[in-house]
Amino acid sequence: MDRAKVIIHMYMSIDGKIDGDWDGLPGDKISGDYYDDQLFRLGSANANGSNTIVMYAAKGHPDLSKYDGQKIEYRDWVPSGIKAITWDVSYDRRGRAGWKKNYFPYAGRRNRAIEVVTKQASKGYLAFLQSMEIPYLVCGDQEINFAESLVKLKNYFDIKTMVLGGGALINGAFLRAGLVNQISLVVAPYISGDSKKKGTFETLGKFIDQRF
């Protein structure tokens, strides 16, 4: 399969939590900056699940009613001539991300947005993405076909390596699908101590029989 390689790249506490009271403290600046610096050394695309995307990159609430009645087919849509040095891939099966721009500024770069959706996303949402010049890939009916998405990301955008930065659920989904090539962990100099916070991987209780 000619697909983009996947590297899970996570910033976590010593006890393996991906967020908490330690995040953003002065003492985590060096390790946090190192994480950001390494991200685009590892690959040209930063990818996240929809929970992370709506929390950080696409916080808007677009009015989709203006797109009612749009005759849009459930097929990939990529603007003609689209080019970027770096990309921001949103795994967003239901179409939740409220983009206000068609890029996400992160790690000193303007990373052009790409949406990976399923047929659960409304046609109004797809019309909204087209109005924003945000390309989208339809990969599945109910659940995302991750392998298909990686093939399309390479074919359409020449993304050779996709860097997956969480959250825990999307990391676990890629692990369960057997699509992770490498794992990169940057550790902050703090212990979270909060058992309610998510760890780096949520595999839904399944052992992943793969050595990294």
Give names to the regions the model predicted.
Residues 1-212:
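Enzymes that bind and transform nitrogen-containing heteroaromatic metabolites
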